[in-house]
């Protein structure tokens, strides 16, 4: 929950970095993208934007928000020669994740940035509208969250203490 760990400044920074900045950048780039007749907007969401995890409330909200913005934008731009791709990486071995001890046992299958980039490039080549990463465990959790969210609540409740310990020093900004 944002109130447990994130300061007001951290909450504001996450909203600005993960939601406000991409929206404003897209707005500034749209005239040139439209004029090109063959543009592409790539939005970086997160698998946590699809299945929200305890202790990542603010981060999940920003990533779900950018995914919803991307979907609305894709529909707004449909037929105008500008596509929108939303990327939902799972845990990625970046400096941001270096302070997290959450591993595969908690559903965090780490990938390299190169693996995420390769998947994104493949999705672009195939004219996909989204690419979801994070391994088979994450895919199963996404499906369960859509079909039976209470089962995900129950599963995460059983992991909550371990997850809290694993991410106690982690900052998602």
Predicted regions and their residues:
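Alpha-helical segment proximal to the catalytic Tyr-Lys
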Residues: 31, 75-76
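Conserved mid-core segment of classical short-chain dehydrogenase/reductases
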Residues: 1-12, 55
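Residue(s) in the substrate-gating loop at a strand-loop-helix junction
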Residues: 46
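Active-site helix of classical SDR
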Residues: 26, 62
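Active-site loop-to-helix junction immediately N-terminal to the catalytic Tyr of the SDR YXXXK motif
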Residues: 52-60, 72
